[in-house]
Amino acid sequence: MKTIGLFFTLLLFITTISAQEKQKQVSFDAKFRKAHQGKVKIEIHEVKELLHIMIAITASGLENDDMVAQTGNYYKDVLKDFEAFKQEPIILTFDSLMKANPLNYIFLTGNTLSYQFKGNKLKADKNYLFPAQNVSSHTTITVNPITTYKKEIEQFAVKTRFRKFYKQHTAFYRQIVADYNNFANLQQQWDWLEKNFNTRVNNYTIMCSPLINGLNYTTSYTDNDFKQIMMVLPPLEKNPALTDKQNQVFNTRIMFTEIDHNYVGAPTKTYKEQINIALQDRHKWVDTTKEGTEYYPNPSRVFDEYMTFTTFYLFCQDAFAGDNAAIKYAYDDINAVLKIRGFMKVQAFNDELLKLKQNNPGKKIDELYPQLIEWCKQQ
């Protein structure tokens, strides 16, 4: 199968557009804040799942098993019920958008939250207005594509009897949510991050789809002093080649390295100028021949990605204390994943951050940045 280098973590920076230019993304009213404060929500959103299915049957989706998870009975069900409609004009339109820029995957699926089904029509959501407007500094949109193609999406849903398909798979969706609640340790991760960083978050929301594979990303929304971290993730995996503990570490890593973007980002912004100097020689830190590294175009983005994964190793030191096998698996896994993706100094970075934390057990990770940046500068 063809891939296009989407096996990496994307962070949607909402700060790349000025307040004057950017349209309002969300509206967290009192009812929303009360319902979500201090809570974790995992959802297979109905309109979002429709768009995942529509993308899955585009030519781009059918040939790309990194963009679309193409294994399991659910994918077989999708093909059985929907592949016959792959020549529909709206599917061809979405395919052309994907071929023009693969990041349209995010703009299409991410903006589905701005609508809910009401019968056969899409009704505007009052809390999520235009949530996915830009991906880093690379691509920005000013018109919600779900609004643009609303009529065609509604017609496709009716023609394919999508809502019946979604209802028939409700039990499967519920099991995905239950697995996250039972095995992902999200509350433990949340508690650890808020203990070790200065950042505070009001709510975590996971938007999941059985059709998500390599393209996982996270973003945050703030309105009325309420901060929500939203992660877009695949279902938890159980690899038969791994032990139960290794599977736990693996699945925790997938989620943790989405969550902690929102914690490492604040001190990175504080020390941006120092980081730009310390990591100015890009070729020391990134193998630019690796596909996907172009989405980390500056020192701050590179530093953040190193921090995201190596902070997970600090978490493992606490979460799996005394379990040397689990900690070693986490260490080897982190180093292998980032090296494959082109972040070749991960092991040294990992070791240095661990040493700093062990030597300064009472300090927040934010406070370790000056020493870590100085170490980077000396490399």
Summary of predicted features, one role per range:
Residues 24-26, 310-379:
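Pan-zinc metallopeptidase signature
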Residues 249-273:
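Active-site recognition of the HExxH zinc-binding catalytic motif
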Residues 265-293:
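Post-HEXXH active-site segment of zinc metalloproteases
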Residues 170-228:
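Auxiliary, metal-adjacent structural segments of Zn-dependent hydrolase domains
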Residues 21-122, 340-350, 354, 358-362:
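N-terminal mature-domain "stem" immediately C-terminal to a signal peptide or N-terminal signal-anchor/transmembrane
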